[in-house]
Regions:
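Short glycine/serine/threonine-rich phosphate/pyrophosphate-binding segments
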Residues: 20-23, 44-47, 74-77, 99-105, ...
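Short alpha-helical scaffolding segments that buttress acidic/His motifs in well-ordered protein cores
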Residues: 196-200, 258-266, 280, 300, ...
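Active-site segments that bind and position negatively charged phosphate/pyrophosphate groups
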Residues: 208-333
């Protein structure tokens, strides 16, 4: 096998305690009129006020848009961009969790190219660069600070939708673990489990033939040497730090591991992509109205059990990264870790009713970009069996 890898990343990535204090000097190199995109809770936070003061001290004018809503409804992104046009920002700064960062990406896109988010759904539909983006995450999970993806919710489709383009990767990302110290245990668990799922799905994704041009034709190309490097590092960090961060939010060493793990997982899946756990979560989330991280983490042990015959070498490497004895220990240990931090053990526990199993399976099978990235194929009946097993809490029937 020829060694092949590709990486898409911010032009500048800062990680470490206190690095948020570099915002003013960085922003001043990108423009003089900054639009901050955040939510109402963070807009009233002292940390955000301090960031605004930094920008103003650097002679950067600031407009704060605190209209971000969970899961970024399409209409909210349209309204935010409309309201910002008269201000004419030079750059957009997203501050907050994954929804705030995805909202910032969407607003920068609409301000740059017009139209509606619907015009850009799918891969590579963004025609060119967007306004310079700075991403400052305050949770450790989605990895949006380094990925080419913005996820929104579309009421007309009753599902989350994605805009995927390298043009959406922030120009600068500032990952300061101190901003996560106040994150509640429940949110820490959900976000961190999402990050661990990103890393595992990126590491176990299908490996495609690296024909020249594949990284230009597709946003998500499957696993490769570079994505594997970041994914394995992320798995090790998250396995070490996640439970500790949930138990003691003031444990700065654990917070650092979780945030760095989430960022590295973003670098991994930003090129490798995710797979079946994400495909199934989208319809599950639509009908149960549960958090994305809860759904993908709940599903991960079942998806890995199905995939196990195709990913034996990867399971051995995950075992090494996680400090486990061998590949057979990985899936039970992952399920136990998730149980200890409060992840539901089955889709039934998540609120999915029996009568929606067939619908979820049908919808999941239709998300071809994710199913085609899965290391073991899933036909419609196999998908139905997988969803039913995850609903009933029965991994054994997938072996």
């Amino acid at each position: 096998m020829n060694l092949f890898g590709t990486l898409r990343a911010p032009r500048e990535l800062l990680f470490g305690a206190g690095q948020r204090h570099a915002l003013g000097s960085i922003a001043a190199t990108l423009g003089r009129r900054a639009l901050i995109v955040t939510d109402t809770r963070l807009a009233a936070d002292a940390d955000l006020r301090a960031l605004v003061d930094q920008l103003e001290a650097a002679k950067v004018t600031v407009l704060v848009d605190s209209s971000t809503l969970p899961d970024v409804p399409v209409e909210s992104a349209i309204a935010s961009a409309k309201n910002a046009r008269e201000y004419r920002p030079d750059l957009v700064i997203g501050i907050g969790g994954g929804s705030c960062l995805d909202m910032a990406k969407s607003v920068a896109l609409l301000l740059s190219h017009g139209g509606r988010p619907q015009d850009y759904y799918g891969e590579n539909a963004v025609p060119g660069p967007v306004l310079p983006l700075i991403a400052i995450p305050t949770t450790a999970g989605t990895g949006s600070e380094v990925t080419p993806v913005a996820v929104l919710s579309d009421a007309e489709r009753s599902l989350k939708v994605g805009i995927s383009s390298a043009h959406l990767i922030p120009m600068v990302s500032i990952c300061d673990p101190e901003l996560t110290l106040s994150c509640p245990a429940g949110l820490t668990a959900i976000a961190g489990a999402d990050a661990l799922t990103h890393a595992i799905e990126a590491f176990t994704a299908i490996r495609r033939d690296p024909v020249p041009g594949i990284a230009q034709q597709r946003v998500f190309i499957g696993k490769n040497a570079l994505s594997d490097h970041f994914a394995l590092s992320a798995i090790g960090l998250l396995w070490q730090g996640l439970e500790a961060a949930c138990k003691d939010g003031a444990d700065q060493a654990a917070r650092e591991k979780v945030m760095l793990g989430a960022t590295l997982a973003g670098l991994a899946f930003g090129v490798a992509g995710t797979a079946a756990a994400h495909a199934i979560q989208y319809p599950v989330g639509a009908v149960t109205h549960t958090a994305h991280g809860l759904g993908v983490a709940c599903l991960m042990p079942y998806v890995m059990t199905w995939n196990a015959p195709a990913i034996r070498p990867e399971l051995a490497q995950i075992a090494d990264a996680a400090g486990l004895d061998g590949p057979d220990d990985v899936i039970p240990a992952l399920a136990a870790l998730f149980a200890r931090i409060g992840i539901p053990a089955s889709l039934r526990d998540l609120g999915l009713t029996d009568d929606r199993i067939d619908w979820v399976a049908e919808q999941s099978s239709g998300i071809s970009r994710l199913i085609q990235n899965n290391p073991r194929p899933l036909n419609p009946q196999e998908m139905r069996n997988l969803v039913a097993a995850a609903h009933g809490g029965d991994r054994a029937c997938l072996i």
